[in-house]
Amino acid sequence: MRSLIPFAATEPKTRLAPVLDPDERAAFARVMLSSVVETVIAAGLEPTVLATAPITDPLPAAASIVVDDQPLTAAVNEQLAADSPMLVVMADLPLLRAADIHDLVATDADLTIAPGLGGGTNAFCTREPAFRVDYHGASYLDHRAA
């Protein structure tokens, strides 16, 4: 199963602008990305980081990087169209555990979603080739309805 980690490499975590400057937000985002990559590897998968710009920080050798300057929704949908089944895990989940990933991929369901507290989508596993994402607003509800 392919595993994809979308990562906004330019201007990450803008909602934290009131408390962190741009360099601090970028460093914070990179640390979380690294944690998620390591967790996906610990779950036995080889992650592909889908980044909006080149990443200069080293990642574990088992991770590959694809750079796509499209908005993340379009970039993820392009990847989904190319391959199925696929696990997609957001890059800002520092509490993610390998067991969480195992739970997502263990089912035979066409779509398994891990919702975020604010109505977003933290991760999903899809076996449905026609599934597409929409990461705006309450994406969890949009993805459930798809």
Residue ranges and their predicted role:
Residues 124-146:
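Short, glycine-/small-residue-rich phosphate/pyrophosphate-handling segment
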Residues 94-120:
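Conserved donor-nucleotide/metal-binding helix-loop-beta segment in metal-dependent transferases, i.e.
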Residues 29-46:
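A short, N-terminal amphipathic alpha-helix
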Residues 2-6, 33, 47-48:
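Hydrophobic targeting segments
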Residues 45-64:
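Acidic donor-binding segment of Leloir-type glycosyltransferases
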Residues 89-91:
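Active-site acidic Asp-centered loop
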